[in-house]
Amino acid sequence: MEKLPISICILSWNNVKTLENTLKSYQKFGLLEMSEDIVVLFQEASEKDVKLAETYQLKTIILKENIGIGKAIKILAENAKFENILFLENDWQLIENENTTFHQLKIGLDFLNKKYDVVRYRSRKKPGYPLHSLKHKGNELDYFDDWHNCTSPHLLESLHWLDPAKEFPDKIQKDGNFFVTTSRWANWTNNPFLVKKSFLLDKILSFAGESVYFERNIAEWWTKQNFKIAQGEGLFMHNDLAKYPKKNLFTKIIKRIKNLK
């Protein structure tokens, strides 16, 4: 298989069962064959963590303490071989086949080459549980968010239940099969994303720092930067087998969507 010029950076913490399920999905749908640079950063690493990574012949960064997401992202980025980074966490299961995955990642590279800043890859139809933005279904333009200090900073996430390019064409448009907008309407998220290493290190981390409160620190600043964001049908479903083991996650999220109608 053709290799993509992408470093796949996976952050994991204290959840071997979920990581094992996630890596099985990456192997099943060929993601592990699409890059020659795949590394897992383990926080509070255990012997089981290390053995699991060795089973898949993955490079590892082993930490005995929990250093927080900001510092962990920085270490992963600094150690990435390629300028393009696909950032994942241990609970993002790949649900699309090999051809779709490869094609969607190639399109993502095209967006980065067209000067887009972030390409997001959470599955549109099967996002997994929880989907926090669902609380804004029906009032997408009518809520104020304290973190971001503005209205509707999560508007792009409405793509999970409607077509935002049709509903909000002055704010979100389509480019091919991808929705495109700016960071004013697409909050920063640690959900799966493709980004340039230089953008992550020089712009994001230089502002947000290495704090455990990374997402909150960046929120208000992010909405004012006019960064270019793209998101298509997506590839990954949130599936944390430790936190949410009892229910089928897709069934649970669909049920919640129906309850909001």
What residue ranges belong to the model's regions?
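Acidic donor-binding segment of Leloir-type glycosyltransferases
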Residues: Y26-I61
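Short aromatic/hydrophobic "clamp" motif used to bind/position activated sugar donors
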Residues: I85
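Short, well-formed alpha-helical segments that are part of the catalytic scaffolds
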Residues: N15-G30
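C-terminal catalytic/acceptor-binding lobe
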Residues: L162, E167-K261
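Conserved donor-nucleotide/metal-binding helix-loop-beta segment in metal-dependent transferases, i.e.
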Residues: E96-Y121
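Cell-envelope/extracellular polymer assembly enzymes that use nucleotide-activated donors
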Residues: L4-S7, D37
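Short beta-strand-to-loop element that shapes/binds the nucleotide-sugar donor at the catalytic cleft/hinge
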Residues: D117-K137
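Glycine-rich, basic loop-to-helix element that forms the pyrophosphate-binding segment
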Residues: N66-A80
